[in-house]
């Protein structure tokens, strides 16, 4: 599997202490081009990010390192977990 590391988001922080990755969250974006979708996910003022963006052809863009907490799940709750961003890849 080849990852494209050309773009990096500044929208991340550290995972909360004790949180391990338990979930993979898949999102869909209606933004038409890869470039515009990536720009949306890395632009600081948008305050949103994802670990990866996978385009229609299967290219994988790595935007946030896996050991960091991307901002993709917002204020969320699942099975007693109140910080999905800290316990997921999204």
Roles of regions detected by a PLM:
Residues 2-17, 22-90:
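Active-site-adjacent loop/helix surface patches within enzyme catalytic domains
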């Amino acid at each position: 599997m080849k990852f494209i590391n050309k773009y990096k988001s500044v929208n991340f922080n550290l995972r909360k202490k004790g949180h391990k990755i338990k979930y993979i969250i898949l999102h869909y974006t209606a933004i038409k081009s890869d470039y515009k979708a990536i720009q949306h996910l890395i632009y600081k003022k948008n305050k949103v990010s994802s670990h990866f963006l996978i385009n229609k052809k299967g290219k994988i863009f790595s935007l946030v390192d896996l050991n960091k907490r991307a901002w993709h799940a917002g204020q969320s709750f699942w099975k007693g977990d109140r910080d999905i961003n800290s316990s997921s890849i999204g």
